[in-house]
């Protein structure tokens, strides 16, 4: 292949990498996959908090691999796929132990009065709500299913295709010094 064409392809892939890395990162800020909003959380553990962002590990894990003529975006976190695609998780004994641990952790953080009653301040009320959530989860039957809604942050969409098409058109126009338009079928 002509070296100029190889350089142009490399430049196109580099431009796509930069643009799509930014766009996929912005999905976490938008709390949507481009224009497709993510389902709100039901869990009271972080009310009003960002969806899919707790420590930011999932957001930072999005990477890409580039070859001579392709680019692939991916994440290697084990829980990324269930969030991106949605699905159901079977409750296990180990999960129930974890839920009980979180319940006791939340109840142990209650602010208490001298007589031992929980305070009625905002933080204690928030923790009581959180504790109830963890108790509800811990009391689920082993083998029952927890539904995880689909919250895509990576993938192909009309917005991705449009951005890629524009990048290709810009680079070809620059290379040939001629207006170029890729029509979608």
What is each of the regions a protein language model found here?
Residues 1-185:
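Short, Lys/Arg-rich flexible segments
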């Amino acid at each position: 292949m002509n070296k100029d064409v190889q350089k142009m392809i490399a430049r196109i892939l580099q431009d796509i990498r930069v643009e799509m890395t930014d766009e996929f990162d912005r999905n976490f800020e938008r709390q949507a996959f481009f224009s497709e909003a993510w389902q709100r959380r039901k869990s009271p553990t972080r009310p009003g908090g960002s969806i899919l962002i707790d420590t930011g590990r999932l957001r930072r894990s999005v990477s890409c691999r580039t070859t001579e003529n392709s680019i692939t975006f991916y994440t290697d976190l084990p829980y990324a796929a269930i969030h991106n695609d949605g699905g159901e998780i079977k409750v296990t004994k180990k999960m129930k132990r974890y839920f009980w641990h979180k319940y006791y952790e939340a109840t142990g953080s209650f602010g208490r009065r001298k007589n031992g009653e929980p305070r009625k301040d905002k933080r204690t009320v928030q923790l009581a709500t959180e504790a109830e959530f963890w108790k509800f989860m811990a009391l689920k039957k082993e083998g029952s299913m927890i539904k995880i809604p689909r919250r895509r942050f990576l993938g192909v969409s009309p917005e991705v295709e449009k951005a890629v098409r524009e990048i290709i058109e810009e680079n070809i126009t620059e290379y040939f010094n001629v207006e170029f338009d890729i029509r979608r079928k």
